[in-house]
Amino acid sequence: YSFQGHGAECLPWVFELAGKYDIKVIAMEVTHDTQVDDILTALDDAGNPTGVMLQIGTRNTQNFELLKAVGRQTELPVLIKRGFGITLEESLNATEYLAREGNSNIVFCLRGMKTNLGDPHRNFVDFSHVPAVKHLTHLPVCIDPSHSVGSRNRGPDGILDVMHVTAQGIIAGANMVLVDFHPRPEQALVDGPQALHLDELSWFLDDMSIAREAHDKRTQLARQYNG
């Protein structure tokens, strides 16, 4: 029953604003094969002011006809999220439908697993699988801390839970972070409770930098001990 978006009619506005504010890339979720053509047409009509990454949501990871349709276009890269209620192997196998159709520009996104074992978070945080995905595939790995945590809660240390799990994923080697920000989360039409305020962006980026430095130091140490 959540907000479903404005559909294709909003695409010209989105691309106009992306160009105006010099946004480099937009992740756009597609749920039907016709939406791919809608996006490509609107992007071309707007003069290609921004990059677009098509997104396959968790509930469509095993929508094989959609995967094949998205895979047949090779202009836009694809972000595919871990599937809803299926194994990691099954989710990774879904990426083969994209690659087999011709699109090998794929990013795999860990976004938490739906189980009450993750309570009080929205989903069970699965960022320990970052190195596992890299071991099993050649794919860059994205983490989605917003959908994993699902709230703006913070610990006794004053650090937001979203930032804690983001650091976990970055230290584990994540290549990309997908996180929700909103100027007024309380008025957001979707996912407001998990969105961070825009004035927290600098804090978030600084915290990410600390986590990245920790990752780099750990990999340097590993090279030292592994010869």
Q: Each PLM stretch: what is its role?
A:
Residues 26-38, 97, 181-185, 211-227:
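Electropositive, surface-exposed helix/loop patches at the edges of structured domains
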Residues 74, 155, 161-163, 167, ...:
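A short beta-strand-loop micro-motif that forms or neighbors metal/cofactor-
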Residues 184-218:
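C-terminal helical cap(s) of enzyme catalytic domains, especially alpha/beta-barrels
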Residues 1-69:
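Active-site beta->alpha loop and helix N-cap motifs at the rims of alpha/beta catalytic domains
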Residues 1-11, 181-195:
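Glycine-rich, proline-tolerant flexible connector loops at the mouths of alpha/beta enzymes
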Residues 116-118, 151-153, 182-192, 221-227:
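Flexible glycine/acidic-rich beta-alpha junction loops that bind and position SAM and/or redox cofactors
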Residues 62-181:
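Catalytic alpha/beta core domains of metabolic enzymes, predominantly
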